Amino acid sequence: MLFPLRVIRRIHREGFRCIPEAIRFRIALHRQRPFLQTETALRQAEEDGYQAFIRRHEAPLSAPFTPTMRLSFLIPTYNTPPELLRALADSLLHQSCGAWEACFYDGASTRADTRELLQALTQEDNRFRVTFGAENRGIAGNTNAALTMATGEFVALCDHDDLLAPDAVRCILEAAQDGADFVYTDEDKVSADGTHFFEPHLKPDFAPDSLRSGNYICHITAASRALMNAVGGLRPGFDGSQDHDLALRLSENAAKITHIPRILYHWRMLDTSFSHQKAQTCADAAARAVADQLRRLHMDADVTVEELRVRIRWKTRQMRIVCLLWGEGDAPKLPMPCIRVRDLSAVNDLVRRTDCDAVLFLRAGLRPLDTDWVSELMQYAQRADVGCVGSALLDDRDCFRHAGYAVDVPGGAVSHQAGQWRYGRPYILTDRIVRNVTGVSSALLMIRRDVFLSVGGFSPYQSDLRGADLGLKCQQIGLLNVYTPYARMAMDTRLSLMPPCLTQGAPKGDLRRFRQTWGAHPPERYYSPLFRPDGSMFIDLDRQEGTP
């Protein structure tokens, strides 16, 4: 039998272990054509409406602002095409706040027109500052040289061929003057000719587990000059992931991290090839950066690269776990003592009387898709900084019924990507990325017993708002909640007939209790206010600036 060339390449890259997954994908693809058609329509609508959205979104803020700081952009250049450098300079000149300087360090460009434009910029506006280096030190070395030129109290990284939104300087300085020493913003991509904007990247607030899985921070990264100097700027030896390494080190040392949920940076997509080998080099560098951080923090884990993604396996200690299996339906084989209960109404007292280190809440009718799912949940639950741990719940059509809860939505709580096909358009690779979330479903939830009891256990909800509420209570005492894609569960046919999101159709009493406890806008850190409130993680194109 002849295999297509792309299959042969994947086997060469990943080994024969990829074949079963590829077969499952082809079968699922055949079954999911209606879902793909719906998703394609949503993507097209987002694409069509985004140009108007970004024009509205970029309208300068009208409220008065008086800067008391200056922002220095660190811009390494090397043979930059003059038209791209000119576009960047113009985006700086068009800033709504003029308290900036641009520190260009040129790594011995051989293009005369690049050097000529840099020289001309210094004559055009004295905020453009240029140093011509004797050699090209690479991205890290050139950026660090630009850092030595900076005079502003705050500094920001900027690529030589990208664009800034008009309020970029203002928004960063507002955050800095509010006490932040590490700031990052949302971003999107722009076509090579600078006319078409696409693929907005709407980020969560600071999420340490998400950051270890991949550099979601990216552009714009800004920090106080004191903090940037304290961490040593960019480190050589992390080519392709030097920004990721920097974000990890800044996050460890920052006193206050602020995420600005506005698209303030446009990353230009040029026609440059990005081979698998380059991707592997970037992934390997990211894994080294993450491993370095864990060593600095004295956190014991193995860090590897799987499918070009960073995978962390935390060293586990012995834990006594008891499973509370609830609801009707079949139960999987469980490697721990199991207590079967009809529902979770009286479970708090049961946990109080149970002698264990951690509790696994598991709904009957779920079937594990990953063989080491228990150890995957346990390795996060044992961490002192973690509250609830959960994973993906997939229905019989491979669609997400749960992938972590967002709470600042009209229905009280909604699952990330509820009802969307697993192989479709997962935002930040939901099926492969460990993420921090506000809450997880009580259908699959592991938590240390002492944490569960210290926050008062489950509140008396009739719906799965209990899981979102428990996550908020853990968050309230400074703990993280974790979604891992490596402990997935498949629903049986009966559960698959439930609404796309487990909180959908919650009783009015549950919604009233949730609002009374957490207010009209609960503290949601990980689901962008620019997303649609249905959990789809598509941008809300109808949203007007200033609306909650």
Regions found by a protein language model. Name each.
Residues 155, 359:
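Short aromatic/hydrophobic "clamp" motif used to bind/position activated sugar donors
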